[in-house]
């Protein structure tokens, strides 16, 4: 028999199983075709979907197999490629003649006798001249001053005369916006109105009344297997050691050259070509004077240096210093004048008054009342409670037959009103089997005959106190 869930048993469209976002009960990987879109928007079989705008594939593959030749292979045929012949050089045959060991320098440059050159040293000027030198620089001799008249300045005539009135130190903002006192404002807060209803709000909903908490299975925890050490001893052999065994061969020979090749038993001469041709000159022995034995003086020390004792000032007066005398700073004003100071005198600066625009508005002297147009002209009115025109509920209507000959009464066929099977906690004729991975409650029919009898229920079954209606929010 085919199993059904609440979604399939419902005939009124208000009951369905909770569609869980994750498969908390799932232990298999089965695709779920139910989604929020397919649940809220059912498909209509009378409406055909529109055709796709995707272009159709009108290209048909040819039955002839394609050749494996490209344009390059067809146009460019292979050529015979011969290996490049390497150039063979002639075998080197050493000559039997002896090398003369002569260079171009030895042939072109003949040796000359070398002698010591006296040092070029300027003459010592031990005796300076006492006469004063008369000199005139080239600039003063070639460039003489001209006697030209003084140029007149090209500046404009000074016509600005500052105002003699004292500046009052007031701004435009201070003149136009004087300081005003505090203004008493009227509160716009509405008055406290009495509450129309003192009944507390009920927080009981259909979800709280009809919600049944399902037991959650215990989470499966994977236990890791315990580590079991290997009982076979470690042989320290790798795949490389087992597959590649070393073969016995000849021992390696040393390629190190001999410490002293044969034929070089002669001692090494430490003379070079430079040492043979350029011998050291005979240097005379330095004359050294024997030191005089020190005899301490018997008189007292005069504390005079050699310069003070042997060199006196000429004419008895010490030499004057050529350094200019330091200038004494004066606290007074410097009275030196120049062309710029004579032509450009310091102006007597005065603070200029700001250019104020002519006031075109007459501002009121009274303080601002801080009232808007709405506050000034709006008159508050007491709220008026309007009467409701909604008719009173006369209670549930009975199954009264429709009177009158109308198209509805003629064509209407009364049918027996059946109650939705999903509104019962346990649908009659079905037994609960399991809860799906997506949260669907699966029910299995008891028998084929019993399910047909239980599907046609009367309206009076709702009055049975043993069966309580299950309200599920759609």
Swiss-Prot record:
UniProt keyword annotations, A-Z: Cell projection, Cilium, Cilium biogenesis/degradation, Cytoplasm, Cytoskeleton, Flagellum, Repeat
Protein name in the entry: Stabilizer of axonemal microtubules 1
GO molecular function, one term: microtubule binding
Pfam families the record matches: SAXO1-2 (PF05217)
Residue ranges of the region described as Mn 10: 333-366
Gene behind this protein: SAXO1
Organism: Macaca fascicularis
Function noted in UniProt: May play a role in the regulation of cilium length. Stabilizes microtubules at low temperature.
Taxonomy of the source species: Eukaryota, Metazoa, Chordata, Craniata, Vertebrata
GO cellular component terms attached to this protein's record: axonemal microtubule; centriole; centrosome; ciliary basal body; motile cilium; sperm flagellum
Protein family membership: Belongs to the FAM154 family.
Region (Mn 9): 300-332
């Amino acid at each position: 028999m085919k199993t059904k869930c609440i979604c399939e048993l419902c005939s009124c469209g208000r009951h369905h199983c909770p569609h869980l976002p994750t498969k908390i009960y799932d232990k298999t990987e089965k695709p779920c075709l139910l989604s929020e879109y397919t649940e809220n928007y059912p498909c209509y079989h009378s409406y055909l979907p529109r055709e796709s705008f995707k272009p159709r594939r009108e290209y048909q593959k040819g039955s002839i197999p394609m050749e494996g030749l490209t344009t390059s292979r067809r146009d460019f045929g292979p050529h015979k490629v011969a290996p490049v012949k390497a150039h063979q050089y002639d075998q080197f045959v050493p000559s039997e003649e002896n090398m003369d060991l002569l260079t171009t320098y030895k042939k072109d440059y003949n040796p000359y006798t070398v002698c010591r050159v006296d040092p070029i040293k300027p003459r010592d000027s031990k005796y300076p001249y006492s006469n004063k030198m008369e000199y005139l620089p080239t600039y003063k001799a070639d460039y003489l001053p001209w006697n030209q008249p003084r140029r007149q300045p090209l500046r404009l005539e000074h016509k600005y005369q500052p105002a003699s009135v004292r500046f009052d130190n007031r701004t435009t903002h201070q003149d136009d916006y004087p300081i005003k006192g505090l203004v008493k404002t009227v509160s716009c807060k509405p008055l406290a109105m009495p509450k129309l209803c003192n009944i507390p709000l009920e927080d009981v909903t259909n979800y709280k009344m009809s919600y049944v908490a399902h037991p959650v299975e215990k989470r499966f925890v994977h236990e890791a297997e315990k580590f079991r050490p290997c009982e076979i001893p470690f042989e320290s052999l790798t795949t490389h050691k087992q597959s590649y065994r070393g073969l016995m061969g000849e021992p390696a020979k040393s390629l190190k050259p001999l410490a002293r090749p044969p034929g070089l038993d002669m001692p090494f001469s430490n003379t070079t070509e430079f040492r043979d041709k350029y011998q050291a000159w005979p240097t005379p022995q330095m004359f050294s004077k024997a030191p005089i034995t020190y005899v301490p003086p018997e008189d007292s020390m005069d504390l005079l240096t050699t310069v003070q004792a042997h060199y006196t000032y000429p004419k008895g007066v010490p030499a004057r210093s050529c350094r200019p005398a330091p200038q004494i700073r004066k606290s007074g004003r410097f009275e030196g004048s120049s062309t710029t100071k004579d032509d450009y005198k310091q102006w007597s600066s005065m603070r200029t008054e700001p250019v104020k625009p002519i006031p075109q508005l007459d501002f009121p002297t009274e303080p601002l009342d801080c009232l808007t147009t709405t506050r000034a002209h709006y008159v508050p009115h007491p709220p008026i409670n309007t009467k409701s025109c909604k008719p009173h509920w006369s209670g549930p209507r009975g199954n009264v037959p429709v009177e009158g000959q109308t198209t509805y009464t003629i064509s209407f066929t009364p049918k027996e009103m059946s109650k939705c099977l999903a509104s019962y906690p346990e649908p009659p004729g079905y037994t609960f089997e399991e809860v799906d991975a997506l949260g669907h409650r699966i029910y299995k029919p008891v028998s084929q005959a019993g399910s047909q009898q239980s599907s046609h229920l009367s309206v009076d079954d709702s009055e049975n106190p043993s069966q309580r209606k299950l309200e599920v929010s759609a």
